[in-house]
């Protein structure tokens, strides 16, 4: 296919490819939950390889295993708009509650230092209406700056660079900060370079991979969103080579009867060839990918954007199920953060009549992550510090 035809083909295919790439997610979640997949006959994976790399000093679950700070503030949304100063105050309070520090700078400096390359892992997948909000990201950047972290140290990243751009994570909106994704498109709308390879192929690190005995097979529409097929999912060089530490900033939303928060944002954002993993290995992927060193040893903090979110129809954007949670969740323990986030979403689903009670299978990926030593899934062992500002 020549460049002109490829340009037209890929531009026309973009929306369809995105839908095709997302389709396995909806299929895997359904109205039940990813946790209700058959547990027998699971495909093999290389999870045993994760333990071969010694745990680093910042390894998950981080400085505060089992500790989660939740800050709620009804004033964080006014006339359907997020109030940035309120969000700033909520994040600041969550940092103080999490660390026990009295000064905000000292709280932040427990996790990051001048000179380090710091990645902000956002989630732009559902489009402008249901992505990590700019108000939350700007508040995090502002507080990092006040703590001595230069903008040149920061990278905002996710799987697909063009999705970041679509929702406003651009150089114009974030001057001095690198914006990058694994899967890329050039200024002409092309996914392929002059060498005939996807730009994304140059962004994956073939020395680091998650192998699963499930074949990834994609058509021409979908391949730019997957980078490669086969049984290997490669970690992005953004993680393995470009960054020292990660601050994970997912959005509070459901996925069927479970949630897609910290672990999912990390796992499916870190690797290529993910379409093959949803149907049979959704839970395993959420937990196991986070056990590999590029994720496990670099994620120092999770800040869940729970200002606006959804309680049904997720992880895609279905406006009839949007809601104002007016909440920030913070913790170093991604498993515990997900467990508390699940409780919040579950309470809303029960209030809306979608469920009468929780489903144990909805916790499956958290329980697997706990068994891998990544954090605390047992609610009775989580130290929840909850503050209501208004």
Language-model region placement:
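N-terminal secretory signal peptides and thylakoid transit peptides that target proteins
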Residues: 1-17
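Compositionally biased, intrinsically disordered low-complexity segments
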Residues: 7, 28, 139-140
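Composition-driven recognition of long, low-complexity, acid-poor segments enriched in small hydrophobic
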Residues: 18, 22-26
């Amino acid at each position: 296919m020549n460049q002109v035809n490829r340009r037209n083909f890929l531009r026309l295919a973009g929306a369809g490819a995105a839908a095709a790439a997302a389709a396995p997610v909806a299929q895997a979640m359904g109205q039940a939950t990813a946790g209700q997949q058959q547990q027998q006959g699971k495909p093999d994976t290389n999870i045993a390889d994760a333990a071969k790399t010694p745990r680093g000093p910042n390894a998950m679950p981080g400085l505060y295993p089992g500790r989660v700070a939740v800050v709620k503030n009804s004033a964080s949304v006014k006339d359907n708009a997020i109030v940035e100063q309120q969000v700033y105050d909520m994040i600041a309070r969550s940092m103080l509650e999490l660390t026990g520090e009295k000064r905000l700078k000292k709280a932040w400096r427990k996790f990051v230092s001048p000179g380090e390359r710091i990645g902000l892992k956002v989630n732009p997948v559902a489009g402008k209406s249901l992505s990590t909000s700019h108000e939350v990201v700007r508040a995090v950047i502002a507080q990092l700056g006040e703590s001595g972290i230069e903008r040149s140290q920061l990278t905002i990243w996710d799987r697909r660079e063009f999705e970041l751009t679509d929702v406003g994570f651009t150089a114009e909106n974030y001057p001095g900060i690198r914006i990058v994704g694994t899967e890329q498109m050039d200024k002409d709308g092309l996914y392929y370079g002059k060498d005939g390879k996807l730009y994304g192929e140059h962004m994956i690190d073939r020395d680091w991979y998650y192998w699963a005995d499930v074949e990834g097979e994609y058509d021409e529409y979908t391949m730019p969103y997957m980078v490669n097929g086969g049984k290997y999912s490669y970690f992005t060089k953004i993680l393995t080579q470009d960054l020292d530490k990660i601050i994970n900033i997912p959005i509070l939303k459901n996925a069927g009867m479970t949630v897609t928060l910290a672990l999912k944002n990390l796992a499916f954002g870190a690797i290529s060839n993910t379409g093959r993993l949803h149907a049979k290995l959704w839970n395993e992927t959420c937990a196991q990918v986070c056990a590999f060193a590029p994720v496990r040893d670099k994620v120092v903090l999770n800040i869940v954007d729970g200002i606006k979110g959804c309680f049904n129809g997720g992880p895609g954007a279905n406006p009839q199920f949007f809601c104002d949670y007016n909440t920030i969740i913070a913790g170093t323990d991604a498993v515990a953060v997900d467990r508390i986030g699940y409780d919040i979403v579950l309470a809303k689903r029960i209030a809306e009549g979608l469920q009468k009670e929780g489903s144990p299978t909805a916790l499956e990926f958290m329980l697997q992550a706990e068994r891998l030593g990544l954090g605390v899934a047992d609610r009775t062992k989580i130290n929840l510090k909850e503050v209501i500002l208004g």
